[in-house]
């Protein structure tokens, strides 16, 4: 049979740790005995993390290669449901593994001859993480509130139509986003007004 690390491909040929192997094993089992077999066969993950959100709850973040993100999102709803059953109700989120390139300064400009693409900037990566996080719901608006002590709070407006599906997870989303980017975020489902 396949080894437990068959579904995980780490950068620089590193070995997956125990938790990542567990996630990889769960994906393999799903591939073997579920109707997701055809879609899962081509897909792999790059990393997995378990973090604490909101006190005692734990969430699992699964990082996937950017080119495979679309394929994962096609089966994400069913995949998340199966994985959450396996890991006893821990929330599971899929996020693409993106790189942030440093801002070119006067000194560093000579090293990298190529211009830094927009998709590798900090802002673009953080926005993309947010979009991956709330999938299948859609972000319909964003407000950044700067408080008097110059701390920022990002208010993210999600699609009201998806409220029933994702409302119970918004605390997890906020915790995961804070852990990955260090930014505070609040999710809302506003009534639509013109």
From Swiss-Prot:
Ribosomal protein keyword on record: yes
Coiled coil: none
Presence of the UniProt keyword Protein biosynthesis in the record: no
Protein's cellular compartments: Cytoplasm, Cytoskeleton, Microtubule organizing center, Centrosome; Cytoplasm; Nucleus
GO CC list: 90S preribosome; centrosome; cytosolic small ribosomal subunit; nucleus; small-subunit processome
Chief localisation class: cytoplasm
GO terms assigned for molecular function: structural constituent of ribosome
InterPro entries in alphabetical order: Ribosomal_eS7 (IPR000554), Ribosomal_eS7_CS (IPR047861)
Keyword tags: Cytoplasm, Cytoskeleton, Nucleus, Ribonucleoprotein, Ribosomal protein
Pfam families in alphabetical order: Ribosomal_S7e
One GO BP annotation of this record: rRNA processing
Similarity comment: family membership: Belongs to the eukaryotic ribosomal protein eS7 family.
Complex and partners: Component of the small ribosomal subunit.
Role, per record: Component of the small ribosomal subunit. The ribosome is a large ribonucleoprotein complex responsible for the synthesis of proteins in the cell. Required for rRNA maturation.
Protein name: Small ribosomal subunit protein eS7
Source organism (scientific name): Ictalurus punctatus
